[in-house]
Each structure stands twice: as C-alpha cells, then as structure tokens.
Amino acid sequence: MKAIAIVGSPRKKGNTEFLTNHTLTAIAEEGMETELISLAGKDIRGCNACMVCREKETCPIDDDLFPLYEKAKAAEAIILATPVYFGSATSNIKAFMDRAGYIAGAERRFAGKIGGPLVVARRAGQNFTHAQLMYWFHILGFYMAGSTYWNIAFGRGIGEVEQDEEGLNTAWNFGKNVAFLTKKVHG
C-alpha cells in the first residue's frame, strides 16, 4: 500500500515539505510505502473547463499534471500539503486539485481512498485553507483521516515550523491515522 503527498509549495525544502516528510515518516513506520511529490518547478496550468475529461480519462493541456494524476490514482492514500498564500492554498496545488479532481471525479476514480490536508501558515488563513483542501477530499469520496487537532503548523522562515511542537505532533498523529485507515480499508 502506498501513500503519496503532493506538496504545493513553490519552495523546495521549505516548511511545508518538512512537515509533510514528518507525516510521511509516521506513515512509513507503519509499513507503508510513501512518496513526496513537490510541485515546485513543475508546469501545472489551471483548468480551462473544456470538459474533455468528462468523456475520457485525459486532459488536453500539455504539462506536468497527468503523470502526477496517474500516481495519485495508483495510491491508496493521498495527502495534499500547502502553505497559506494570501489567505488560501497556493495556485499550483489549486491547479492540481481542479484538474485532477475533474479527471477523477466523473467516474469517482478517487472514491474510497484515504486522504487529508496539511497546512503551514505564518499566522492566519490556515482554517480556510484547511477547509479548502478538505472539501476536495470530501467531494471526491475520500475517507478523511483526522488527528489530535487541525492538521496545521506554523512557521514563516525556512525551518521555523520545526519549532511548532504541537503542529509536529498533530502532523505525526495524522500520519499514523492515515496508515491505520488505509490498512483497515485497503488491507
């Protein structure tokens, strides 16, 4: 069984990637295969609502999305991770959500998978962003793993999130719950 985490930060090796790796370590400890996929530097354009994906499982936009969609489709668990940018999810994670959601949604291809969000904020916007990602999991039929608090940690400068002890514990427990649910549903 495999869990993938798609990190929507445009920065590699930043706070969101650190928090996501922390969560993936908790999942791997439970015997699952894990993979972090960073969207930093990837060419993923926004959806143009052409609806080709409603007819067949493809997208006519020629960029880096479809191989990532295939990895998501093959995984039993998917985590979406994003920093808060201007009170919301980043544009690249949103483009992934829109397009992968449309491609998968028509035939409920993600239904029954395990999922959940991870959010990193400086000081605000985290609740809306967390909900924004949760709605994606909800509408696509995921079983969502919870934790001991919202799956949120705080930090702005690179490495600051490592000081958020409660955020790290929450992310760790979230990872354990992702693994538990995945084994129960797909084991």
Name each model-derived stretch:
Residues 8, 12-17, 45-54, 76:
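Cysteine-centered iron-sulfur cluster-binding motifs in ferredoxin-type domains/subunits
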